[in-house]
């Protein structure tokens, strides 16, 4: 957080959708970020326990090793849904836009009731624990940053260290780092539009910003170039931090302000 004029804003980079199905692309993303001076200790890494219902992390040693190595180097591991796949449909205009246009059916918790949300959280936690990734179970980011009202109540009651929505990181009832930059890689038009938006965001005021990188971004040379450009520009004036380090600094600041 840019607490004072002498303090740079925070650059919060998250690597989404790590699973056996995306391991190669995730390794590429980590390597790309390292070239830009973003080491593992400044990363927040989102792991899908049972991607698409057919790729459990605990049954794939290479993915486990990748995540453990990142954690050993200081990355913060986070549970990212269970399967990453939404069940059912959303019929309201806003719900349809969020679930089927923005998230493209990936908003796993967007239509969940409390029972389903609890079940998915319990199953995801069990898989990560079997994989020896206990720390990842202490925080949560829903796929596409979407939670139904019932799912949000469940997540809030679980007592996670933090959870994240599209409009910020929720920690002890407070919301932090509201700005987010990400890229879309579904088609050339989306890729160009999101790259242009990201470039514009890097020029705006010096506030804490989240940068979300997805495996699909590594499949398009255009998006890799856009990520390099945006991260290099932000890195030049901001402080890279994992969510853990960032939130600890917010607690210290709030505590000092209250004295």
Task: Describe each model-derived feature in a short phrase.
Residues 1-76:
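Active-site beta->alpha N-cap acidic-glycine motif
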Residues 6, 37, 41-47, 162-163, ...:
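C-terminal domain-boundary segment and adjacent tail
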Residues 11-15, 43-45, 77-80, 138-140, ...:
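Hydrophobic faces of well-ordered beta-strands that scaffold small-molecule active sites
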Residues 12-18, 23, 184-246:
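Catalytic grooves of carbohydrate-active enzymes
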Residues 18-28, 48-62, 85-88, 114-115, ...:
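Acidic-and-aromatic substrate-binding clefts and catalytic sites of carbohydrate-active enzymes
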Residues 77-94:
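Short, solvent-exposed beta-strand-terminating loops
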Residues 92-112:
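Active-site gating loops and adjacent loop-to-helix segments of metal-dependent hydrolytic enzymes
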Residues 108-185, 223-224:
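Catalytic domains of cell-wall/extracellular-matrix polysaccharide-remodeling enzymes
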């Amino acid at each position: 957080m840019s607490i004072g004029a002498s303090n740079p804003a925070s650059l919060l980079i998250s690597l989404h959708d790590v699973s056996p199905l995306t391991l190669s692309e995730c390794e590429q993303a980590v390597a790309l970020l390292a070239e830009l001076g973003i080491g593992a200790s400044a990363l927040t890494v989102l792991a899908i326990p049972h991607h698409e219902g057919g790729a459990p992390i605990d049954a794939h040693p290479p993915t486990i090793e990748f995540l453990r190595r990142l954690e050993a180097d200081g990355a913060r591991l986070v549970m990212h849904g269970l399967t990453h796949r939404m069940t059912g449909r959303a019929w309201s205009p806003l719900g349809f836009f969020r679930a089927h246009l923005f998230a493209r059916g990936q908003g796993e918790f967007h239509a969940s009731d409390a029972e389903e949300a609890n079940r998915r959280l319990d199953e995801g936690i069990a898989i990560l624990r079997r994989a020896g990734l206990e720390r990842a179970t202490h925080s949560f980011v829903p796929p596409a940053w979407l939670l139904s009202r019932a799912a949000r109540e469940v997540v809030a009651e679980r007592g996670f260290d933090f959870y994240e929505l599209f409009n910020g990181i929720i920690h002890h009832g407070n919301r932090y780092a509201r700005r987010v930059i990400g890229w879309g890689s579904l088609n050339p038009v989306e890729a160009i539009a999101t790259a242009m938006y990201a470039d514009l965001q890097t020029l705006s005021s010096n506030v804490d910003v989240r940068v979300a990188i997805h495996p699909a971004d590594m499949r398009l040379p255009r998006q890799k170039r856009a990520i390099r450009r945006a991260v290099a520009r932000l890195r030049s004036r901001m402080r890279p931090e994992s969510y853990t380090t960032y939130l600890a600094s917010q607690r210290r600041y709030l505590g000092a302000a209250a004295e």
